[in-house]
């Protein structure tokens, strides 16, 4: 029997516990790591630090569990230095993705009605009036949909240079390897 699901990073999810879970059928984890910068993780109220995220990535890598790490570039209040720190975090931790980890690059953050980002727009420095292409804009207009997509593009270029695996038929090409689950004939360590 195989099982998997949605997870969050936690200090108790160490290599030993994850290896035990793999031994009883864990074969897929969708994990909300979201970012590698402490400031952004605090704004998201994730209750984790970049060290916690790095520890989880290392533990998942060592246990050979297949995981998909969700990543959000361009979160409200993210500045250029935060983005550079994200790139450094990915550079420092790219070795933990190997053949069993994927980075799910989420192109942009939407602000849905009645969510904390909507209710506390002033705190997140998001304009209440200005939009561009029907998407939110920061008060200083340094965070727009186009900037968020450009950041995602830069991360894609970096991922390509590190030969990260990518998931999805639209990303298959000479430059990307495709991670296939074990049930569909994928290669170990799935």
Q: What does each of the following model-derived ranges do?
A:
Residues 1-68, 73-75:
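Conserved SAM/AdoMet-binding glycine-rich loop
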Residues 18, 44, 73, 80-82, ...:
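A generic "cationic amphipathic patch" detector
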Residues 73-76, 109-111:
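Short beta-alpha junction loops
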């Amino acid at each position: 029997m195989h099982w998997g699901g949605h997870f969050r990073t936690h200090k108790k999810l160490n290599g030993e516990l994850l290896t035990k879970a793999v031994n009883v059928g864990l074969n897929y984890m969708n994990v909300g790591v979201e970012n590698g910068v402490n400031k952004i993780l605090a704004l998201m109220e994730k209750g984790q630090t970049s060290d916690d995220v790095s520890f989880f990535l290392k533990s998942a890598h060592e246990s050979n569990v297949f995981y998909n790490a969700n990543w959000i570039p361009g979160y409200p209040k993210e500045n250029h230095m935060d983005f550079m720190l994200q790139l450094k975090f990915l550079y420092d931790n790219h070795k933990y993705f190997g053949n069993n980890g994927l980075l799910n690059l989420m192109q942009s953050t939407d602000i849905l009605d009645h969510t904390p980002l909507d209710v506390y727009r002033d705190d997140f420095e998001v304009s209440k009036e200005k939009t561009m292409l029907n998407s939110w804009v920061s008060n200083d207009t340094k965070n727009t949909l186009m900037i968020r997509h450009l950041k995602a593009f830069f991360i894609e270029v970096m991922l390509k240079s590190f030969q990260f695996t990518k998931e999805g038929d639209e990303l298959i090409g000479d430059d990307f390897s495709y991670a296939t689950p074990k049930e569909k004939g994928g290669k170990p360590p799935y």
